[in-house]
Amino acid sequence: MGVLAYVNTFTVPFLLDDNAGIVENDSIRHLWPPGRMLSPPGQTTVAGRPVANVTFAVNYALGGLNVLGYHILNLAIHVLAALVLFGIVRLTLRTPGLENAYGAAASPLALVVALIWLVHPLQTESVTYVVQRVESLMGLFYLLTLYCAIRGFTSERVWWSVGAVAFCALGMATKEVMVSAPLMVLLYDRVFVSGSFREVFRRRWKPYVGLAATWVILAALVATGPRIRTVGFEFKDMAVLDYALAQGPIVLHYLRLAFWPQPLVFDYGWVMPQATVGVAPGVLAMTGVFAASVLALVFRPRLGFLGAWFFLILAPSSSVLPIRTELAAEHRMYLPLAAVVVLVVVGCRRVGLSLPRSWRRPAGAGLAVVVVALLGYATRERNGDYRSPLVMWTDTVAKQPDNFRAQNNLGSELKDAGRLDEAITHYREAIRLKPDCQPAYCNMGTALTLRGEYAEAVDSFARALLLKPDDDITHYHVGYCLLRLGGTAEAVKHFRQAAALTPTDARRRQDIAAMLAGYGEVEEATGYYREAMQLKPDWPEPVNNLAWLRATHPDAHFRNGVEAVALAKRACELTGYKAPWTLDTLAAAHAEAGDFAEAVRVAEKALEIASSSGQDEMVKVLGEHLALYRSRRPCRERPEEAKPYRAGGVRR
């Protein structure tokens, strides 16, 4: 069932936070030595979550950035979690207090619970959105911790308890929500096995010491502050009480989605309430649900355990700890949904007992098949919204038009698709909704730049810099626009600022160098090329570009055939002498050095490779260059102006 519901996700591209957490995450590029992948970059979804980062490193080792492997592993994790949930529910329904009522039906009831939880559309964000593997993997470890603990309660084998502690430790290093796992194991023992906390600790205090010790792992990871910009108590615009009050209607919304999973939203953009009265109904309703759970835990503890499961697992993200970027997120319901499903399935079983005996089994089986089929279909349909970033953000804006982030990100996707007028409309809407939305100003500037409206773009970038003066991307774009407007001196200042703000970014220096070279600032460009080469010695692009400049610049003062040959040979070595563009540069360098015979030989090799690989445009250029060398003339050409401009902007 899981494969049927998620088979259309295997080609879903990387989205939003996948870029920082996977695509741009250098820590997953190598499995050895392991220290790098165990130290994921800060301010990303994998920050402080080394176990999840290791799984991404394994994916990268097996298939690079091919999304297929990532989605297969995400689905495998989800299916395994459903299987473990099946085991937990079945074992629980066979405990002494429940066996008489549910023991005979434990397996089919557990199967229905697991299937509904597996195919429920509310789970799509945790499975289809690749980087949210942190949620599903944590969920798997959470369930494995409880399953091993349950088996250990009735077994003489110590390995079940050891397994519980081991999985708990892995979960703590996967996501912070795992913090409640030792408490849930303790509560389960008290409610379903031992009958009292005194009896729990009398029988088996040692496993709980081990489980509690895993909090040290979590504390150590949290202490590094990897997401201090997005999670914490120090935000002036997000007080603890306000955040907690906002969670009332949000959690109520989660419960509604559990029963009616429409509409599902990728990014809610839920805003902080401006007045308490606005959230009062939701807060009162959730207070009632919470109070009922507490009372049930006291007077009907087996029922109350479901409420405790729901609220304790949601607590780290949906109570008093402000998460600035997301007040609401569907992936937070990954594990809490299980409590709702168990309650509904067991409740339906109780209702079904009122039917005539001959009707019970077919009615129950029929209802289960219909519900699972409908939920599976809805999940498959929802997964279709993930097929491209443009589709996803279009869907999000349609459902949440007041979400400034969604408006901004839809604008960026439209810009990338060449639909600049539409993109600018959405950027302006994002700014209307949030006048201090710095990324929208920056992104609108890039769209205006692509339309050739450089003066207007500079105005937009200037507003972005007022909001965030240390934004290297904005300085870079301003520099480009000023170059196009003739303000070379001011442009150089902004380029220098962009470089200073990114002291280890070779790409930024390469782009600045290529742009400056295109506008005649050769000395400045040469310096940035050399910095890029020092920062990333095995990257051929800056080496090749500097070689091209030294070989072909129209001003003899900047040409140097000997240096050009040395640089071009290095670029060819880095590309295995198989890249037509580096061979083209080497041929030009030999021609500048006066060795036209070698220039012809290398150019012919480049032409052969380009022809065999269907690079028609490159074939045309190489043919022109080859004709020059055969007539004993060197290549003289200014660097291509348009090439270095990268209108990436800022998404969020």
Set out the residue ranges of the language-model regions:
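Polytopic membrane enzymes that build or remodel cell-surface glycoconjugates and lipids
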Residues: 1-456, 462, 468, 473, ...
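Structural marker of alpha-solenoid helical repeat scaffolds
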Residues: 399, 433, 467, 501, ...
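Conserved alpha-helical positions within TPR/SEL1-like repeat arrays
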Residues: 405-416, 439-450, 473-483, 507-518, ...
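Alpha-helical adaptor scaffolds
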Residues: 446, 540-582
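Terminal, low-structured helical/coil segments at or just beyond the last alpha-helical repeat
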Residues: 558-562, 570, 577-580, 585, ...
